[in-house]
């Protein structure tokens, strides 16, 4: 999914190689990404989180989804307008791993977010719109549980001391419309 062709570079960078340590993700970068997705007619992935009666809570508009690293989260928390997930008015539609929202993007943090080697470590923040990608079932065994009981290893386990249990899974995802997703490449603090 990170291989999408719609790329935005932080600050004044024009390529990944020209990103410097000071070119961190910012609210302006997020707003520029949202503007690009709107211009590409990308749909939003979430519904509005309606306001509630709780103290110090905020409604959240319908949003695109951003996938970020923990290092990117550190920088985004300093941006004006950042709403941590704890301040959402209604937490029933919070996604697993969701950490907050900024402008029209709700962010999900993962330790598997993409990084690229360059003059500095470049982080790739994905901003996804509706129908950017699709997933499909794999025919046959998409999930297979494998159990080898004690003694099944023959002469390599003559005392029947080892048994194993494991699984194999197949998963297919494909980019459907390059214009409905965007990767922001940037440095982090």
Descriptions of predicted regions:
Residues 8-51, 62-67, 71-189:
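Sequence/fold signature of self-assembling virion shell proteins
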């Amino acid at each position: 999914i990170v291989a999408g062709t719609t790329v935005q570079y932080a600050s004044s960078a024009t390529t990944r190689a020209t990103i410097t340590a000071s070119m961190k993700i910012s609210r302006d970068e997020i707003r520029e990404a949202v503007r690009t997705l709107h211009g590409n007619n990308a749909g939003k992935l979430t519904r509005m989180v309606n306001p509630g009666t709780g103290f110090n809570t905020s409604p959240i508009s319908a949003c695109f989804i951003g996938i970020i690293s923990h290092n990117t989260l550190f920088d985004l928390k300093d941006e004006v307008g950042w709403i941590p997930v704890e301040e959402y008015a209604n937490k029933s539609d919070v996604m697993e791993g969701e950490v907050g929202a900024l402008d029209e993007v709700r962010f999900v943090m993962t330790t598997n977010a993409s990084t690229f080697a360059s003059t500095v470590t470049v982080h790739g923040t994905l901003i996804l719109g509706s129908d950017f990608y699709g997933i499909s079932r794999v025919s046959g065994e998409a999930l297979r549980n494998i159990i080898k009981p004690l003694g099944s290893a023959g002469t390599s386990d003559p005392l029947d001391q080892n048994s194993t249990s494991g699984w194999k899974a197949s998963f297919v995802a494909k980019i459907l419309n390059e214009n409905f997703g965007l990767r922001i490449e940037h440095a982090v603090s």
